[in-house]
Amino acid sequence: MKEIIARHKAGEHLGICSVRSAHPLVIESALLFDLNTDNKVLIEATSNQVNQFGGYTGMKPADFRDFVYGIAQEVGFPRERLILGGDHLGPNCWQNEPADTAMEKSVELIKAYVAAGFSKIHLDASMSCADDPTPLDPMVVAKRAALLCQAAETTATDEQKRHLTYVIGTEVPVPGGEASAINAVHVTREQDAARTLQTHQAAFRALGLDEALNRVIAIVVQPGVEFDHTQIIHYQPQAAQALSAWIKETPMVYEAHSTDYQTRQAYRALVRDHYAILKVGPALTFALREAIFALAQMENELISPEQRSRVLEVIDEVMLNEPGYWKKYYRPTWSQAMVDIHFSLSDRIRYYWPHPRIRQSVEKLIANLNNVTLPLGLISQFMPVQFERLSEGVLTPTPHNLIIDKIQDVLRAYRFGCTPDVA
C-alpha cells in the first residue's frame, strides 16, 4: 500500500480497488483478474464479517487470511501481491454495549487482525456505544482510535511494521449499506477532514504514537457518492473541489466507501481527485447474483423440471423464512419486498449465499449446466456482454467462467479508473 500511495502522491494517476467481500467466487474473480499483471490485489474484511468471535461469516481474522490464501493457491496468485485489510475496525459490532466493554473488545479485534497479518487497518471508533452521547465528540473518537492504534503497534512485529498502514475517519453511511432511501448526500467539508486529521494527530502523540502517524496513509471521507436499494448518487467533481485541494497539502490520500455502481469515468475522476482507494462490495455480489439468476434461466430452458436446481425458489424460501438480514432494510409491502430481495442495489442476498440450502442449489445449478452445451444464442439472451467476450475468443462458455467474467465486469470499470493507460 505504501508504494501505491507514494506513487500517487508523486503525481501518477494511480489508485487501487478495495474488494470488500468474503464470497469465494468474488475473491477468485479478483485474483484471476490480476493474475497476469504486476498489480497488487487488496481484499478487505469488515468487523461484522470477520472478528475474534467469528462474525457473520464464522471466520476469525486468521481463518479469513487462510481462506483467501487458499483461493490464491488454487488459482496460482502469489501471496506477495496480496494485501489484506480490515475495515471499520472498532466498536461497530458492540455499539449496544457500554463504551468500556466495547473498546476492550475492539482492542482485541485489532490485535487479532494484526497478528493474522492484515496490513491495512481502518481505525474507526466513530460510532456511539450504549452509554455515549450521539454524535460522539471528535476528540473522543480520535482518542479511541489512538487506543486501537496502540494495540496494533504493540502487536505488530518489526517486519509487519514495514508494511503496516492505517486509515482514519469514517464516511456518513453506516457500514453495510443504507437502511433507508437517499435523496442527497453530504459531501465532507475540507475543514472537517482537517479536524479529523488534527484530532487524530493530537491523540496519537498523547500516547507516544508519533512513529505510527507516519503509517496513516488515508482519511475516509464522503466525496458525494452513495447508493440505496433503487438509486445511485453519482460523483460530481465540482462539489468536492475544495476537499480535493486540501488533501494535496498532506502526505495522504482519501479512501472512498460506497463507490459501487459509479461509472468508469467517475472512477477515473475520483482517482484524479485523490480518492486513491475505492471500496467496492455489493456491486460485486450484485454481479454474482445477476450471473446466477441468468444461469437459472438457462437451466429452465435446458434441464427437465424434475432435474432442476430450483435455485431461485430456494433463495426465496430461505430469505422469507429467515428475514433477519433484509427485513429492516426493505419495503414492508410483500410485492415490493420481493423486488427488493431479488434486485436491490444494496444486495442483501449476499448474506444468504453461505446458507446450506442455497449453496447446495447453486452447486446443483452449476453441475446441471456443466453436463450440457450452453447454446451461444442462450448466452446472448441472458448474458450479452459475456456473449461478446465469447465471440472475441477470450472466454470459454462454462457456468463457472461465466460467473467469474460477470463479476469481472465490475472490476474492469475500476481498472479503468485506477490505471491511466487502460482505455
From Swiss-Prot:
Signal peptide start-end: none
PANTHER family xref list: D-TAGATOSE-1,6-BISPHOSPHATE ALDOLASE SUBUNIT GATZ, N-ACETYLGALACTOSAMINE PERMEASE II COMPONENT-RELATED
Family: Belongs to the GatZ/KbaZ family. GatZ subfamily.
Entry keyword Oxidoreductase: no
UniProt-recorded name of the protein: D-tagatose-1,6-bisphosphate aldolase subunit GatZ
Assembly and interaction partners: Forms a complex with GatY.
A Pfam family: GatZ_KbaZ-like
GO annotations of cellular component type: plasma membrane
Species for this entry: Salmonella choleraesuis (strain SC-B67)
Taxonomic lineage of the native organism: Bacteria, Pseudomonadati, Pseudomonadota, Gammaproteobacteria, Enterobacterales
Cited Gene3D superfamilies: Aldolase class I (3.20.20.70), putative tagatose 6-phosphate kinase domain like (1.10.400.20)
Protein's job: Component of the tagatose-1,6-bisphosphate aldolase GatYZ that is required for full activity and stability of the Y subunit. Could have a chaperone-like function for the proper and stable folding of GatY. When expressed alone, GatZ does not show any aldolase activity. Is involved in the catabolism of galactitol.
GO terms of biological process kind: D-tagatose 6-phosphate catabolic process; galactitol metabolic process; phosphoenolpyruvate-dependent sugar phosphotransferase system
Pathway the protein takes part in: Carbohydrate metabolism; D-tagatose 6-phosphate degradation; D-glyceraldehyde 3-phosphate and glycerone phosphate from D-tagatose 6-phosphate: step 2/2
InterPro entries: Aldolase_TIM, GatZ/KbaZ-like, GatZ_KbaZ_carbometab, TagBP_ald_GatZ
Source species, domain of life: Bacteria
Keyword Ion transport belongs to the record: no
Family annotation (NCBIfam families): agaZ_gatZ, PRK15052.1
Annotated keywords: Galactitol metabolism
SUPFAM superfamilies linked to this entry: Aldolase (SSF51569)
